[in-house]
Amino acid sequence: MKQKLLGMLLLGFASGLPYMLVFSTLSAWLRDVGISLTEIGFFSWLVLTYSLKFLWAPLVDRYSIPLFGRLGKRKGWILFCQFMILIALLGMSASDPIKSLQFLAIFAFLAAFFGSVQDIAIDALRIEIADNQDQGNLAASYQLGYRIAILVATSLALIFADQLDWRHVYQFMSILMIVGMLGVIISHEPINKEIAILRMDEALLLSFKDFFHRFGIWTAALLLLLISTYRLTDIVMGPMAMPFYLDMGFTKTEIGALVKTVALAASIAGFFVGGYLIKNLLLTTALLAGGAAVLVTNLFFALVANLDANLSLLSLIVGLDSFAAGLVGTINIAFLTSLVSKKYTAVQYAMLTSFMMLPGKFFSGFSGVIADYYVSISSLQTGWAYFFYTTSAMSIPALLLIMVYKNSHATHSS
């Protein structure tokens, strides 16, 4: 089991690194060189690939990558994607957002696309290498690796960016994909005898039908609606976090050295507490606690916006928000895993994560428009405060849906 946990830790790192480099850190790069909030918001649509991965998940179930597939179907896909991500990140490092924003966008899209395919294969591998009772530990290990990657791709990248050109920073980050390749090497891939090898249209249709058959039309529809609204607040707020810190007068080194370090420690605590809650509470109760925590901690950012730059206060609030994010991350992985049939592992998990991500990613594209609008009708500080009031309110529908589901279909985590 220890080798499985270590492998998932390294693969979690490989998942988190490209995602942050085409999302949060890219937002900081763009804002740092003077790109508008509106354009930065639209850039977040590049990572819609993570929300649409159910469309190409059947390929991961059906086909093996030539040469790479000798390692195993899942491991072959993961390693192939890691090589492609490395190349795409190098392409980003060769781009100049001021002279050719489109060129940067193309390579960012490629990194996001292959990052999403990598996630499909990693999720499938994680589900297949252990039974349900061990999924909480694997999810926590994956989240730990993911959060370490976030620290590296944000904190370390920001500190370097104060001393080096952003393009050199991305060159260095691309090399770190080797960590994920080590995770592939030490991971053992079992043979999944339950998997159904289907055409893409068959896989999507049958996995969808299987989900509704197992839960019933009413419960399945309720679950999909709950999943699609549960992460709205933090996903919509995400693209604007780095621009917000910079607009409030904090330096890249301050953000990287203190704020993001606190964020990692808090998120690690959050996902281990999430694992504890999964084992000791109803899964729906854990979902409710996580959703409420995200709503409250997001509101705290409005306090930062209304006060003068205070690094200690920002670190505290980022810590609380990161704790909530880690909590929700682990709980959400366990929740989605509990809904998946092993017959359609990759496709069904990708479908559910897509339902979780797609609404938030769609609205996050307008996050810069919203922030620019609020700033234009008030002041910089007041406008940002209004923005966080708006994102916090986005958690309310999910909390109501969880209570409806909890009252009628409460389930225990096993």
Language-model-detected regions and their locations in the chain:
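C-terminal ends and interior cores of transmembrane alpha-helices
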Residues: 77-98, 292-309
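A membrane-interface helix-boundary motif in multi-pass transporters
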Residues: 71-76, 159-175, 369-397
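Helix-loop boundary and gating motifs at the non-cytosolic
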Residues: 1-50, 221-226, 230-244, 248, ...
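Helix-to-loop junctions at the C-terminal end of transmembrane segments
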Residues: 53-70, 269-283, 371-375
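C-terminal transmembrane helical hairpin of 12-TM major facilitator-type secondary transporters
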Residues: 285-335
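Juxtamembrane intracellular "pre-TM" segments in multi-pass secondary transporters
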Residues: 1, 189-223
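Glycine-rich segments within core transmembrane alpha-helices of 12-TM secondary carriers
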Residues: 50-53, 136-161, 353-364
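Multi-pass alpha-helical transporter architecture, strongest
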Residues: 90-96, 179-188, 389-414
